[in-house]
Amino acid sequence: MTTLTASPNRIAQYWALTKPRVTQLAVFCAVIGMFLATPELPSWKIVVAATIGIWLLAGAAFAINCLVEREIDSRMARTARRPMARGEITVPQTLVFSGLIGGAGMWVLYNFVNPLTMWLTFATFVGYAVIYTIILKPATPQNIVIGGLSGAMPPALGWAAVANDLPMQAWILVLIIFIWTPPHFWALALYRRDEYAKSGLPMLPVTHGTEFTQFHIWLYTIALVATTMLPFAVGMSGLIYLVSVAILDIIFVWYAWQVYRHYTDMIARKMFAYSIIYLSLLFAALLVDHYLRF
């Protein structure tokens, strides 16, 4: 039976399939991209339509991820309560749900935004749900690096929605998230390394050890600091962003150094939590600077 029943509990289960907390951060970055794409305020109709369309396709991609990794999720404490890991939603139901919301998202983007945004968002869906989840994640410890582009695309999707174009500035935003992703995710993988070892996924701390992973977190953090200077260097942002990102970077570097030289699971956990705050505040600083630049 593949009927999508509408009881409150069932709705909550389908909502959980979309990984709402992860989706919220992705859509937040997309919305910031919309505002950065124009010196004026973007059309509220475009902002609303693009937000809905991108959210729906992101949710569809995460639902496929939950489907593919349901057995792996059931073996990990962090993910064992996901609906598919608990057998609360079937494979056919998930496929129907993902197809419905993904199709709806494409329809919204094509009809109310522009075809470029629709195709870019669909390509991002394929990149995450297929290339990363099905092909790369179970095959290589560099999965998060190679497959990170799909997760880094939201600001470019937002930019394309408003400008119908992807200039250098949009790709700088993508690059920031692309470089941010490995230290963010590897911090999680470090303190969850035993769970990942049981799952069978070739995560970097499992295949190459904790010290190797700690060192690469440090390397990517240095690269991240350099990358986050680009908006100011190319004239995309001003002093508000520069001061804000300098403070954010100093804290990120401190956490990365602690993970590298004085590792504990607790400091890795704190770095992971901070990395989410870091990205949110960085994009918020870009937005404030965009309209209040001096």
Swiss-Prot record:
Subcellular location: Cell inner membrane
InterPro entries referenced in this protein's UniProt entry, alphabetically: Protohaem_IX_farnesylTrfase, UbiA_prenyltransferase, UbiA_prenylTrfase_CS, UbiA_sf
One annotated Gene Ontology cellular component of this protein: plasma membrane
Signal peptide coordinates: none
PROSITE patterns: UBIA (PS00943)
Stretches that traverse the bilayer: 22-42, 46-66, 89-109, 116-136, 143-163, 170-190, 212-232, 234-254, 272-292
Enzyme class: transferase
Main location: membrane
GO biological process: heme O biosynthetic process
Function: Converts heme B (protoheme IX) to heme O by substitution of the vinyl group on carbon 2 of heme B porphyrin ring with a hydroxyethyl farnesyl side group.
Family: Belongs to the UbiA prenyltransferase family. Protoheme IX farnesyltransferase subfamily.
Record's miscellaneous remark: Carbon 2 of the heme B porphyrin ring is defined according to the Fischer nomenclature.
Protein name: Protoheme IX farnesyltransferase
